[in-house]
């Protein structure tokens, strides 16, 4: 089997970068893109000057201004971001047809069969970065590796404006030093559970056989076993289409009642809005839904056609879903089904209520 060559390209603070490009007076100052604080807006992204103050994506604009009083917050211009994204994807298509967009600002490319630069994935990534910089006047970071899991980690390794390469013969050593929190699909709760088992990095994870991991983590144990060895067989799908977009949170301490669940909704919905703003224009938001997993691992999902995507609608759905079990809750999720427009264009105003 031919060794795969995967590139993960991730634009550096994409929305903010476009704003600074189009208005140079914003460069070098703390900048965020998002909704206004007086309308309970949320930060979609921010530049590195703002991040130095602790400002982060999905944070409320009000809290961001408390951390950084000099922060400039501009409204999202989705048309401009989508146009820039199209230009970047046009560049990608010069090297391969196997492109899997993850959002407006990141994508996987499979260049295993590309003849450009003698088939060198590293040189292709270098050229993509050069062309994006020259044509769009923004920077992107890229990771090159034998699979998607490692390519995504690599693209983050030297951010911003960096390139990191993991060759096949470097995989075993590179992965052995990774903290388990870096593994695809490992969130805080799973990382904490691994830590309690004495597993903090992939070298320690490799000491566990597959069956033992399955006993502890169910089917995800098999995935952990593979990732600890740098194995990821997922293909780059250029025709993959999202069915939904959602946000879930597993709580360290079970939520004891409906009131405590409802209190968690606003934060989940703010994060959902941020994620929805990153999907491309070929989707239209459809039915909202909620997911509840109870302390005994039973779960229920409720979606409602015709319901709004406002806080009140989600509160009503969550109440109905909770009442199906009426038990302490370990996981809450909120989401939206997506309608595939296949290239349709619709402006989504997701940051202002």
UniProtKB/Swiss-Prot annotation:
EC number(s) per entry = 2.7.7.7
Q: Which UniProt keywords apply?
A: Cytoplasm, DNA damage, DNA repair, DNA replication, DNA-binding, DNA-directed DNA polymerase, Magnesium, Metal-binding, Mutator protein, Nucleotidyltransferase, Transferase
Question: Pfam families annotated for this entry?
Answer: IMS, IMS_C, IMS_HHH_1
Catalytic residues in the record: 106
| CDD domains (UniProt xref) | PolY_Pol_IV_kappa
Top-level EC class as recorded in UniProt:
transferase
The Gene Ontology CC terms held by the record are:
cytosol
The note describing how and how many cofactors are bound reads: Binds 2 magnesium ions per subunit.
Q: Where is the signal peptide?
A: none
**A Gene Ontology BP annotation from the UniProt entry:** DNA-templated DNA replication
Which InterPro entries does its entry note?
DNA/RNA_pol_sf, DNA_pol_Y-fam_lit_finger_sf, DNA_pol_Y-fam_little_finger, DNA_polymerase-Y, DNApol_IV, IMS_HHH_1, Rev_trsase/Diguanyl_cyclase, UmuC
Write out the annotated subcellular location.
Cytoplasm
UmuC domain ranges (all copies): 6-187
Q: Which residues bind Mg(2+)?
A: 10, 105
Task: List the NCBIfam families hit by this protein, alphabetically.
Answer: PRK02406.1 (NF002677)
- Family, per the entry? Belongs to the DNA polymerase type-Y family.
Q: What is this protein called?
A: DNA polymerase IV
């Amino acid at each position: 089997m031919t060794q795969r060559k995967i590139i993960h390209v991730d634009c550096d603070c994409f929305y903010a970068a476009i704003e600074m490009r189009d208005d140079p007076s914003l460069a070098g100052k703390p900048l965020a893109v998002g909704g206004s604080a007086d309308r309970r807006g949320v930060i979609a992204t921010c530049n590195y000057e703002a991040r130095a103050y602790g400002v982060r994506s999905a944070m409320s604009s009000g809290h961001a201004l408390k951390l950084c009083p000099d922060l400039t917050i501009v409204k999202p211009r989705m048309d401009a971001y989508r146009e820039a994204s199209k230009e970047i994807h046009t560049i990608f298509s010069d090297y391969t047809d196997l492109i899997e967009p993850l959002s407006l600002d990141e994508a996987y490319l499979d260049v295993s069969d590309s003849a450009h630069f003698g088939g060198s994935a590293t040189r292709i990534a270098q050229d993509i970065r050069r062309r994006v910089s020259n044509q769009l006047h923004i920077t992107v970071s890229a990771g090159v590796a034998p699979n998607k899991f490692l390519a995504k980690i690599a693209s983050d390794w030297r951010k911003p404006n960096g390139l990191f390469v993991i060759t096949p013969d470097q995989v075993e050593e590179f992965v052995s030093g990774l903290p388990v929190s870096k593994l695809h699909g490992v969130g805080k709760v799973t990382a904490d559970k691994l830590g309690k088992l004495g597993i903090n990095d992939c070298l320690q994870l490799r000491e566990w056989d597959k069956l033992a991991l399955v006993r502890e983590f169910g089917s995800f144990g098999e995935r952990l076993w593979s990732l600890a060895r740098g194995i990821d067989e997922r293909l780059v799908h250029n025709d993959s289409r999202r069915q939904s977009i959602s946000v879930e949170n597993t709580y360290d301490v079970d939520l004891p009642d409906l009131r405590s669940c409802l209190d968690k909704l606003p934060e989940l919905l703010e994060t959902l809005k941020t994620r929805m703003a990153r999907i491309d224009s070929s989707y239209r938001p459809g039915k909202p839904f909620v997911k509840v997993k109870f302390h005994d691992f039973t779960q229920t999902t409720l979606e409602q056609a015709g319901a709004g995507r406002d806080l009140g609608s989600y509160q009503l759905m969550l109440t109905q879903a909770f009442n199906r079990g009426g038990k302490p809750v370990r996981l809450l999720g909120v989401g939206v089904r997506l309608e595939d427009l296949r290239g349709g264009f619709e402006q989504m105003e997701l940051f202002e209520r």
